[in-house]
Structure formats: structure tokens, C-alpha cells
């Protein structure tokens, strides 16, 4: 039995999709365990670039089972659009499985998300307005509608009527806007469910059977540790648990069945949306990193905020996610910058802090303590091993591994699959 979890160690957008796609080649099952279509991942397969939001990266391999686990919230309309997107490009989706316990995003979740974000004014958290938060709220409040309900005409109608009575009062009384009628949603979304039905099953059985039969299973996280609802920069976070512990809850696989946890990070830092960002760059170097690294959101198209590598953040990710392996991406983006900086600690009110403060007022006051390293000018996009890296690039990579306390297993020098290099095999380590 070999199972590997891929976790983002920063604020998402670390290149998890590419690494998951790369590792998918040697897995028999690929599963997502949290989030929804608020996360985007870009995969290059057969020379073609694909952008996915819900469906796991392994979908391009016909012989591999791809799982949307119970921990996700699924917009049926968005899922069908993504299926069509793949079908139109000749990609089969017969290998997809969707949990019958996954919760469903409905139009009132999208409306609630938009209205709540608008009402916060300057205190907005930067939601993607995909209905993710409200769907997870309903799940916690035990009024959510699950895939199993969507496929049952009577159950779906009964729960939809109950929920709309509540949601419409919210829209009218709190936001002074009209809600929805049952007729506006019911038939359309029930039909969506019927189109998805062929994929729906108990995915916990699928995953545990695979592991019991010694198949390699790859668990694919969305977002990143710093967006985790418990361990991220709350409240500027997502509504689920991207940390490795989210796998057990979000797929129905016990923790003893997870063997390796790969932390994916960039050689610098980026984030979309609001919230504290200690190493953020507002200068010409920041602009250069953003343009060279094409730092614009896959889902939103928003320019990402960028900054120096923050080892405090990645050490935090190592601790709360139990990271065993490091995958360092986008090293090539730093080429040509004369002096590179790595944040090794924070300083606040004269005190040195080695961990991420839970209090955001304190985090906002934190000044990064930097260590400087010389940059490199050589083109590294064709490098295929650590030894081929220029001395300064190799020293930078090694220092990142030392400061984070995570053994380097993979590094990437460009966006293509063949620019990802293996230092050690995570399935056999």
C-alpha cells in the first residue's frame, strides 16, 4: 500500500496541479478531498494546456480512477461544464467517480456568497463568489443537500423547499432582495443530477478497496495550508481543510493509510485576495516576478500578490500537515534577480517570532527577518538534475530545504511536465 498526499504549503497557486499530474503517472487512483470549483489548476498534457477546477488532474489517464471525495462541495452546473470542456477536447471521463456524500452548491449559495461579500465593504475576505462558503455553512448547520439527495426526486424537492423558505427570508429581510422560487431551481438541478448520476457512488469504498489491494493512491489538495480554515490566516481563508489531515475526513480513508505527504511550494510566495502577507513585494522586483511567473489567478484572472520565500510559513505547513517531502517549483522565475531574500523569522515589537501568529493584528505588524543569497543569471529551464543547477541556484534550493526542515524530493524549472525533476521517488521513499 502506498498513498501520497499533495498539499500546498503557502496560499495556494503553488503548482500543485502540475505536481499532481506528474505523480499521477505512477498512481492507480487520484482523489480530491476538499474545496470546490473555487480552485483552479493548469495541466499541460500531450502538449495541450487544460484548466480544471473540480475534476482531479489524473483524468487524462483513462486507466486511472479519479475521485471527487465527500469533503468537496460540488456545483453540478460547473461540473457538467467541465465535463463538456473535456469531452469537446476528446478526453474521456468514464474514469470519474463522485461521492454520494459530497454536498451540492445551488443558486442560492452563489447569491448568498455575493451578497455577503458585498456587505462587508472594506472587510471583505476576497471570496471567489462560487458559493463555497455558504455551502459549507449549510453542511455544518445540517441543512445541506448532498449528491445522494440530488438524485432522489422527492428528497431533493422536500429539502429544497425547506431551504428556500429559510434562504428567501434571509435575502428579503437582510439584503432587501428577492429570493428564488422552487420552480426556478428544482427541474434544472434535478436534471443536472441525472446527467451526473453515472459517476456517483460511495467513493470511500472505491478508495479503501484500492488501498487494500496495494494500489497507489494520490490525494490532491486544493488551495494551501495558509488558507486552511483552522490553520491558515483566519478569517482570510477558505471554508475547508486543505491540510493533509483533511484527507481522512474528506475521503473516508483512515489516517494510518497515508504514507507520504508532499508539500508543494514556489521558490517565492504568492497569494490571491486579502489578508496579511509579511514578505509581500510592491517594487519592481515584485512586478518582475509577477510577469515572469504569470501570476494571475486560474479561476479569477486576478493579479496575484507576490513576495519573497517565507520559511516561517512553510515550517508552519510542515508542522500542521506532517510534510515528509518538498516539491520546490518555479525556481526559474527568480533567474536574473541579483540578490534573493528568504524570510527566516519575523520581528514584532522588538521580539523575534519563529512561528505564524494566530492573532492577525500581530501578524500585520510583523516585519520579515531576511537572509540574503546571491542570484544567478544562467538559463536553468533545461536543467534535469540538482547537479546541473548553477552553484547559486543549487545553494538557494538547498537553503530552502534546510530552513523548512523538509527533504527535497522534486524541483521544477518551468511549467512543462518535463521540467519537473525527481530527487527521490515519493512512492518508494
Curated annotation (Swiss-Prot):
GO cellular component, one term: cytoplasm
CDD domains assigned: AdSS (cd03108)
UniProt binding sites for IMP: 13-16, 38-41, 128, 142, 223, 238, 302
Metabolic or biological pathway, per its Swiss-Prot or TrEMBL entry: Purine metabolism; AMP biosynthesis via de novo pathway; AMP from IMP: step 1/2
Domain of life from the UniProt record: Bacteria
Annotated binding of substrate, by residue: 298-304
Matching SMART domains: Adenylsucc_synt
Keyword Metal-binding: yes
Ranges in a coiled coil: none
EC primary class: ligase
Catalytic activity, EC: 6.3.4.4
Protein localization: Cytoplasm
One annotated GO molecular function: magnesium ion binding
UniProt xrefs under Pfam families: Adenylsucc_synt
UniProt cofactor(s): Mg(2+)
Chain positions recorded as Mg(2+) binding sites: 13, 40
Alphabetical UniProt keywords: Cytoplasm, GTP-binding, Ligase, Magnesium, Metal-binding, Nucleotide-binding, Purine biosynthesis
Active site residues of this protein: 13 (proton acceptor), 41 (proton donor)
Cofactor binding, note field: Binds 1 Mg(2+) ion per subunit.
Catalytic activity: IMP + L-aspartate + GTP = N(6)-(1,2-dicarboxyethyl)-AMP + GDP + phosphate + 2 H(+)
Keyword Cytoplasm among UniProt keywords: yes
Family: Belongs to the adenylosuccinate synthetase family.
PANTHER family noted in UniProt: ADENYLOSUCCINATE SYNTHETASE
Oligomeric form and interacting partners: Homodimer.
Role summary: Plays an important role in the de novo pathway of purine nucleotide biosynthesis. Catalyzes the first committed step in the biosynthesis of AMP from IMP.
Protein's name according to its UniProt entry: Adenylosuccinate synthetase
Native organism: Bacillus cereus (strain ZK / E33L)
